[in-house]
Amino acid sequence: MGYPDRQVTETRNTVSFSAAGHRWGVILAGGDGTRLQPLTRLACGDNRPKQFCPLLGGKTLLAHTRQRIAKAIDPDHVLFVLTKKHEPFYKRALESIPGFQKIVQPHNQGTLPAILWSLLHLFHADERALVAFFPSDHYFGDEAAFISTIERSFDFAEKEPDSVILLGAGAERPETEYGWIEPGSVTLSGFGREFVSVRRFWEKPPLETARLLLAQGCLWNTFVMIGSVAAFLEMIRNTAPVLFETFKSALPHSEVEFDERKMQVIYDTMASSDFSREVLAASTERLRVASCGEVGWSDLGEPRRFIAALAQNGTDNPWAATDICNKCGLTHEQIVTLSGPEKNKIQFHESAMLSSSR
């Protein structure tokens, strides 16, 4: 059903594989961001998801993500997975993006359908695609180290097209709200210790387990993934065959666009599903993990973690310190803004499950 090495043409848009090769990116921007709504309401006055909120340096988190990955992937080869009800928040920012690059879900049903739709859409355009998936609303303090790992992972995926690479961040504390990756001991000949097997996933472990994982050198799961489009699709077909065939049936053989009416029915009748839990956890034999080191990564999933990233970024948002404490349910015992030469740091008590930022 794919057309390798061809041009995909639509009104006012031509995707040329000769310019950017077969490297693609997918930004997952369809989430609702409910955990951070107290903060986004404070910043924007509405319930927009955090990826569409200018929380760092006056730019939205989506804009930061686009700027970051443009260092590794041609912007013409970046797809956006969105959700229809969020259109008022992304329409203006993405109005110059061709329709081929925007996948608009009827509503948010989790990461698995969002990823599957984008993979089928991309495979129909370029069967030889190597694709990297990026959350739209995360933070990386050391972007150079992050991008370097992305580049090396693309190189690895090109040589080992049956593998899928996960990017792990060096853990800085026993975080109980993150997913963890326990590396295995298997390496591929010629690649040293940079890309190793995955023994197990640990999703939001209790504190004692998180302390053990930290001591053992396990990594935080950034949910950045790189591999061939064929490898990703095979993983989903093996672990979620019903969903795979259901989505495949909605993709015409002669066009790139999905049947919107079919997709509406599919989304209305399907249950929410999680890619990490339902696909990755059941496919560890195919996975490799690459550490990008202590890059200051945060998922910005809660106000406390956002404030830590704000401090690390050196951004001065005047509404942040006092209002977030009051309106997001944080006490002054949980968060203390330091002054003097350390004013760019924020310190959390252990009860808040965070230590001071680097």
Task: Show which residues each predicted segment covers.
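A conserved hydrophobic position in a structured secondary element of the catalytic/binding core
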Residues: 82, 134, 205, 227, ...
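Short coil/turn connectors at secondary-structure junctions
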Residues: 21-24, 75-76, 98-99, 126-129, ...
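Left-handed beta-helix
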Residues: 2-22, 227-358
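Solvent-exposed alpha-helices and their adjacent loops that cap or buttress functional pockets
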Residues: 16-20, 45, 71-73, 124-126, ...
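Conserved core of the sugar-phosphate nucleotidyltransferase
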Residues: 142-266, 287-288
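Conserved N-terminal catalytic core of the sugar/cofactor nucleotidyltransferase
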Residues: 2-30, 35-49, 54-147, 151
